[in-house]
Amino acid sequence: MFTLLSYFAFLMLALTFTLALFVGLNKIQIL
């Protein structure tokens, strides 16, 4: 159970990081 929760937290963290990086690149392209 703990490993599953840790895996889910890591997945959400990776998804958030990817989304933030994508938005950052879009802002750089717009500028």
UniProtKB/Swiss-Prot annotation:
GO terms for molecular function: electron transporter, transferring electrons within cytochrome b6/f complex of photosystem II activity. GO terms for biological process: photosynthesis. It is a single-pass membrane protein. Keywords: Chloroplast, Electron transport, Membrane, Photosynthesis, Plastid, Thylakoid, Transmembrane, Transmembrane helix, Transport. Pfam families: PetL (PF05115). GO terms for cellular component: chloroplast thylakoid membrane; cytochrome b6f complex. The keyword GTP-binding does not apply. The chain crosses the membrane at residues 4-24. Disulfide bonds: none annotated. It is found in: Plastid, Chloroplast thylakoid membrane. Component of the cytochrome b6-f complex, which mediates electron transfer between photosystem II (PSII) and photosystem I (PSI), cyclic electron flow around PSI, and state transitions. PetL is important for photoautotrophic growth as well as for electron transfer efficiency and stability of the cytochrome b6-f complex. The 4 large subunits of the cytochrome b6-f complex are cytochrome b6, subunit IV (17 kDa polypeptide, PetD), cytochrome f and the Rieske protein, while the 4 small subunits are PetG, PetL, PetM and PetN. The complex functions as a dimer. Belongs to the PetL family. This is Cytochrome b6-f complex subunit 6. It comes from Adiantum capillus-veneris (Maidenhair fern).
